[in-house]
Amino acid sequence: MKLSIISAAFLVAITHAASIKFNVIAPNATDVKVSVNGQQVTLTASDANVPYFTGSAEVGASKTYKYVAGGTEESFDRSLDGITNSTLNDFYNRPVTYANLPQLPWPIEKDPQWTRSGSKADIFDDNYIPSVFFHGDDSQVQNVVKNVPADRISGTLTFIGSNYVYSFQNVSFGIHGAGKKHNNAKQSWNWILSGSDTMGNRNFFKLRHMEEDPTQIRERLYSDILHAMGTYANDATMVRLFINNQGFGTFNMLDDITQFSYINAKFYNGKPPATLGPLYDGASGADFLYHPGNLDGYSSWVANTANPNGEAYEALDPLCKAWNETTYTDNTAIANFEKMFDLDRFMRFMVIEYLTADWDGYWMGQTNDGAYRDPTDNNKWYFLDQDFDGTFGVNLAAPEGNAFLDVSYKDFPSRYPGAVMINNLLQNADKKATFEKYLTETVRVLFNNVTLTNRVLALHNFLLPDLEWDRSIVQQSPGINFGWTFDQVTQNLWQGVTAPNNNGGGAAFGLVEYIAAKAQAVAKEFNISIVSQPVGPPSANGTTAAAPAPAAGNSTGKGGNQSISSSASSNKTSAQSTSGASRSKTAPIVLAISALALLVF
């Protein structure tokens, strides 16, 4: 017993003497310290172009810490609970480093998840907001920002994630879709990594400005839902962007499905075959309609310039011909066509296009789609979906107005006859039954005012401090500025809002308002009961886990309640930092003595 008492005391002494490595991103700061254990310890940045400050400090008996930048101390405490060697990469004046967002359930039993891409890349971690720093020649940067040409800038890009830092040289950086007539002043951007460099098995990254959506959640949420549906949709997450140390705001970082970077990651887990299949970007008119004797009828399918053997849009002809010649009511004929085209996951995409009123997608608009032919899967074609900004009621123009949400999917074929793939597929009784099963089960457990709203509110609360920063930025490029205010970021969850600059911006539906109304309409049509508690994905034992609900928290004073405790930053401290931090030498000693104490007792 005496030995156990000595061990416990020794354990306390060693724990209190621990040295912790602190890591913080502090834009526009040069003098950064950590305040802990009654002292302020200076942190340093190894790269003058990246405000990423690190350093070690003795924590003693302290339970909390905070950062000081330019003499200004953070107004809140950060918890040291669970941190034994290094903090995550904190961001100055952001109380939550790492969240605990509720995950969505998997509503489809058959092939519930897409597994060919492997585990989710850490760069798309739901619970962390990465910071992206690009540095290039200042005159070139100023030209691109002020004059918005299609010019590319070569420079250095640093990507700071939760517990790692990636840095790349010779990165090609520029405006995505430069020169379009209706671009926003907050431009969209992209970058291409050099040579064999990759990040998360990708080399091409797109940053969407999300200016159509005051909440800046809809497009990311759409991808979240599609992943829960077991599809190969593009990954997406919010990042902060800085160009030559100037803040440009929050952006949705996502795959561009028209690039082989996306195909390599989502279809081959970073290990593509020696020869890839042809990839196509579906512009307006990309509808899968057969054009006998007129190969130019497929010109809406824009071929990727890197397609093997230079395969152009003519490659769509055999697929469209086969669909045109299929007897849609015949199960055998449908089964034969499925050897050529993945109909099952195509239906999953269509379920979500319908539920979100994706007017700028395939079913309603025959646009913003794509196609890929996979040489490793008997040359099967896969439908691709993209650009999810016109969803959940954004810019929705329908003669019924708000009553459009009551329109049944059964009316879509007559309203949107150009979508020949889904419309003809629904002529098959078995496929129609499968579609309805996917639709109703998705609404019952996921797409409703219980489960999905639970995630929306948690995500909103987590992102809110950064959205306040984003709304404060005066964009430097020419283009449309709707003038959305920070208050409208929250208001548009619950109700429609009008752009202050009266120059467009169609946010006539609140995001949660839309979800609740659409779910109720489908539930009424099919007489289904929506879950009463939020549902999560299957747990390790095979049962369906309940999703955590957003907790009440301290008011931020301006945009709602901050629901995620700042102690969430300790939830991932077991992961070893790759930014150069070394594990505290006291950790093995603590573990050994703890074990000894337990044995003695």
UniProtKB/Swiss-Prot annotation:
Record region (Disordered): 539-581
Record's signal peptide: 1-17
Entry keyword Membrane: yes
Glycosylation sites: N28, N85, N170, N324, N449, N527, N541, N554, N561, N571
Organism of provenance: Rhizopus delemar (strain RA 99-880 / ATCC MYA-4621 / FGSC 9543 / NRRL 43880) (Mucormycosis agent)
Lipid-anchored residues (GPI-anchor amidated serine): S579
Record membrane topology: Lipid-anchor; GPI-anchor
Protein name (record): Invasin CotH3
Swiss-Prot/TrEMBL GO biological process terms: adhesion of symbiont to host endothelial cell; adhesion of symbiont to host epithelial cell; symbiont entry into host
Oligomer status and interactors: Interacts with HSPA5/BiP on the cell surface of host nasal epithelial cells.
Alphabetized UniProt keyword annotations: Cell membrane, Glycoprotein, GPI-anchor, Lipoprotein, Membrane, Signal, Virulence
Main location: membrane
Source organism, top-level taxon: Eukaryota
GO annotations of cellular component type: plasma membrane; side of membrane
Inducing stimuli: Expressed during growth in host lung and brain, and during growth in presence of epithelial cells. Induced in presence of high free iron. Induced during growth in high glucose. Induced in presence of 3-hydroxybutyric acid (BHB).
Bias (Low complexity) ranges: 539-579
InterPro entries, per the entry: Ig-like_fold (IPR013783), Spore_coat_CotH_CotH2/3/7 (IPR014867)
Disruption phenotype: RNAi-mediated knockdown decreases invasion of human nasal epithelial cells by R.delemar. Simultaneous RNAi-mediated knockdown of CotH2 and CotH3 decreases invasion of human epithelial cells. Simultaneous RNAi-mediated knockdown of CotH2 and CotH3 decreases virulence in a mouse model of ketoacidosis. Simultaneous RNAi-mediated knockdown of CotH2 and CotH3 does not lead to sensitivity to cell wall stress (induced by Congo Red, Calcofluor White, hydrogen peroxide, sodium dodecyl sulfate, or Triton X-100) or alter resistance to killing by phagocytes.
Subcellular location(s) of the protein: Cell membrane
Biotech applications: Antibodies against the protein protects a diabetic ketoacidotic (DKA) mouse model and a neutropenic mouse model from mucormycosis infection, and nasal epithelial cells from invasion by R.delemar, and thus could potentially be used to treat the disease.
GO MF term set: host cell surface receptor binding
